[in-house]
Amino acid sequence: MHFDLVDMRLFVAVAEARSITHGAERSALALASASARIKGMEAALGVPLLERQRHGVRLTAAGESMLEHARIM
Protein backbone atom coordinates (compact mmCIF):
# COMPACT_ATOMS: atom_id res chain seq x y z
CA MET A 1 0.00 0.00 0.00
CA HIS A 2 1.40 3.34 -1.05
CA PHE A 3 -0.16 6.74 -0.54
CA ASP A 4 1.37 9.92 -1.87
CA LEU A 5 1.45 13.31 -0.21
CA VAL A 6 -1.59 14.47 -2.19
CA ASP A 7 -3.60 11.53 -0.80
CA MET A 8 -2.55 12.27 2.76
CA ARG A 9 -3.20 16.01 2.52
CA LEU A 10 -6.58 15.32 0.94
CA PHE A 11 -7.51 12.91 3.70
CA VAL A 12 -6.59 15.46 6.38
CA ALA A 13 -8.60 18.16 4.57
CA VAL A 14 -11.64 15.87 4.25
CA ALA A 15 -11.39 14.81 7.89
CA GLU A 16 -11.09 18.38 9.15
CA ALA A 17 -13.91 19.65 6.92
CA ARG A 18 -16.05 16.56 7.58
CA SER A 19 -16.87 16.78 3.88
CA ILE A 20 -15.37 15.29 0.74
CA THR A 21 -16.63 18.29 -1.23
CA HIS A 22 -14.99 20.85 1.04
CA GLY A 23 -11.86 18.73 1.43
CA ALA A 24 -11.55 18.54 -2.35
CA GLU A 25 -11.93 22.32 -2.61
CA ARG A 26 -9.25 22.88 0.03
CA SER A 27 -6.97 20.49 -1.85
CA ALA A 28 -7.69 22.06 -5.26
CA LEU A 29 -8.98 18.74 -6.60
CA ALA A 30 -12.13 17.94 -8.52
CA LEU A 31 -14.75 16.22 -6.39
CA ALA A 32 -14.67 13.08 -8.56
CA SER A 33 -10.89 12.85 -8.25
CA ALA A 34 -10.97 13.38 -4.49
CA SER A 35 -13.68 10.79 -4.02
CA ALA A 36 -11.76 8.28 -6.15
CA ARG A 37 -8.57 8.89 -4.16
CA ILE A 38 -10.36 8.33 -0.84
CA LYS A 39 -12.02 5.16 -2.16
CA GLY A 40 -8.63 3.99 -3.41
CA MET A 41 -7.13 4.48 0.04
CA GLU A 42 -9.98 2.51 1.59
CA ALA A 43 -9.57 -0.29 -0.98
CA ALA A 44 -5.81 -0.47 -0.40
CA LEU A 45 -6.31 -0.68 3.36
CA GLY A 46 -9.30 -2.99 3.16
CA VAL A 47 -11.31 -0.90 5.62
CA PRO A 48 -13.61 2.12 5.37
CA LEU A 49 -12.00 5.34 6.57
CA LEU A 50 -15.14 7.43 6.32
CA GLU A 51 -18.77 6.88 7.12
CA ARG A 52 -20.61 8.71 4.39
CA GLN A 53 -23.69 10.49 5.70
CA ARG A 54 -26.37 12.54 4.04
CA HIS A 55 -24.58 15.76 4.98
CA GLY A 56 -20.86 15.10 5.10
CA VAL A 57 -18.70 12.33 6.45
CA ARG A 58 -17.60 10.98 9.79
CA LEU A 59 -14.33 9.19 10.48
CA THR A 60 -14.43 5.51 11.34
CA ALA A 61 -12.02 4.13 13.96
CA ALA A 62 -9.63 3.28 11.12
CA GLY A 63 -10.09 6.81 9.79
CA GLU A 64 -9.16 8.29 13.17
CA SER A 65 -6.00 6.19 13.19
CA MET A 66 -5.16 7.19 9.62
CA LEU A 67 -5.69 10.86 10.49
CA GLU A 68 -3.09 10.65 13.26
CA HIS A 69 -0.55 9.18 10.81
CA ALA A 70 -1.47 11.59 8.01
CA ARG A 71 -0.94 14.63 10.23
CA ILE A 72 2.60 13.47 11.00
CA MET A 73 3.42 13.56 7.28
Predicted segments — roles?
Residues 7-14, 66:
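Short alpha-helical "packing" element that flanks the helix-turn-helix/winged-helix DNA-binding module
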Residues 1:
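C-terminal effector-binding regulatory domain of bacterial HTH transcription factors
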Residues 17, 26, 39-48:
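Residue cluster at the C-terminal edge of the helix-turn-helix DNA-binding motif
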Residues 12-31:
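Short helix-boundary/capping micro-motifs
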Residues 42-59, 64:
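A short LG(V/I)-centered, amphipathic sequence patch enriched
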Residues 4-7, 31, 63, 70:
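The N-cap/first-turn positions of alpha helices
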